[in-house]
Structures are given as structure tokens and as C-alpha cells.
């Protein structure tokens, strides 16, 4: 009787030690949690590009806008991926009908820059090749 009890106690002590050593904050991953996204990640870049594309479709401005700076990028995985972006957007010198809009220079004159701070939420289901703009909010910077 003592031997099974000792084995059980040893197993529990080993498990407790393993849990304690892996419970550091940086090692915790909570399913459905929101985490900082890697801006170098191809999927994150696709979602950001989609957000800016949808933003440009919705604006009545003839000039194309693109990110000046990504202030924050986060992601959440559950039944797909939610991406959350906080972006400073600037007005370029290119009209929306021009090719290669991603390399357009920004307006230098302050009255033409029209900078905005925008928050975008993108939902993607990669295995269905589906992406949608869930929420978009912008204000003058």
C-alpha cells in the first residue's frame, strides 16, 4: 500500500514542479487571448494591406492613403484569426487610379497631409480564404 502512495506522491510532485517552472508569464498562452502580432509575419501584413485597401475603397478622397506608422498590432485566434491594428495613416500624392500605390510618396504640405489615426479589426478564416473588415474607426491626427 505504501509503494503506490509513494509513486503517486512522486508523480504529483514532478507534475507540480513542471507546472511551476512553465508558469512564467512569457510562457503562458491562453486560448482566445489577444497577443502582440509580429509585423514581419506574412499573414499579419496581408491583413494590414486588406484593412488599408478597404479603408481606401470607403473614403471619397481621390488620393490614396497608406500607413505612416503602425502603432500597435495584435491578434487573437479562435475559429479564425482576429487582427487589431492601430495605424497612423497619411495621404499620398497618388490618386487611387494609379498603379503601384504602395510606394507613393506622402504629401509634404501640412494642409494636404490629412493624417488620421485609425483602428481596424480584421477577421480572417485562412482555410476558407475569407477575410473581412469587422470594424474601422478613424479620426484626424
UniProtKB/Swiss-Prot annotation:
- Where in the sequence is Phosphoserine found? 21, 23
Site features described as Reactive site, chain residue numbers: 32
Cellular component aspect of the GO annotation: cytoplasm; extracellular exosome; extracellular space; vesicle
SS bonds (residue pairs)? 94-104, 118-138
Q: In which tissues is it expressed?
A: Expressed in submandibular and sublingual saliva but not in parotid saliva (at protein level). Expressed in saliva, tears, urine and seminal fluid.
The primary location reported for this protein is secreted
**What is the recorded post-translational modification?**
Phosphorylated at both its N- and C-terminal regions.
Listed GO biological process terms? detection of chemical stimulus involved in sensory perception of bitter taste; negative regulation of proteolysis
Which residues constitute the signal peptide according to the record? 1-20
Q: Where in the cell is it found?
A: Secreted
Coiled-coil stretches: none
- An MF annotation (GO) of this entry: cysteine-type endopeptidase inhibitor activity
Q: Which InterPro entries match?
A: Cystatin_dom (IPR000010), Cystatin_sf (IPR046350), Prot_inh_cystat_CS (IPR018073)
Q: Where do we find the motif Secondary area of contact here?
A: 76-80
- Which Pfam families does this UniProt record tie to the protein? Cystatin
Q: Alphabetically list the UniProt keywords.
A: Disulfide bond, Phosphoprotein, Protease inhibitor, Secreted, Signal, Thiol protease inhibitor
Please describe what this protein does: This protein strongly inhibits papain and ficin, partially inhibits stem bromelain and bovine cathepsin C, but does not inhibit porcine cathepsin B or clostripain. Papain is inhibited non-competitively.
User: Per the similarity annotation, which family is this?
Assistant: Belongs to the cystatin family.
Supply the name of the protein.
Cystatin-S
Gene that encodes it: CST4
Amino acid at each position: 500500500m505504501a509503494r503506490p502512495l509513494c509513486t503517486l506522491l512522486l508523480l504529483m510532485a514532478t507534475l507540480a514542479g513542471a507546472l511551476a517552472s512553465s508558469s512564467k508569464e512569457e510562457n503562458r498562452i491562453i486560448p482566445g487571448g489577444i497577443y502582440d502580432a509580429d509585423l514581419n509575419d506574412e499573414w499579419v501584413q496581408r491583413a494590414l494591406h486588406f484593412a488599408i485597401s478597404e479603408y481606401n475603397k470607403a473614403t471619397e478622397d481621390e488620393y490614396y492613403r497608406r500607413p505612416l506608422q503602425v502603432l500597435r498590432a495584435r491578434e487573437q485566434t479562435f475559429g479564425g484569426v482576429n487582427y487589431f491594428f492601430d495605424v497612423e495613416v497619411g495621404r499620398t500624392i497618388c490618386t487611387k487610379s494609379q498603379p503601384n500605390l504602395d510606394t507613393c510618396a506622402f504629401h509634404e504640405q501640412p494642409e494636404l497631409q490629412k493624417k488620421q489615426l485609425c483602428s481596424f479589426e480584421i477577421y480572417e478564416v485562412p482555410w476558407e480564404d475569407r477575410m473581412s473588415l469587422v470594424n474601422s474607426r478613424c479620426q484626424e491626427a
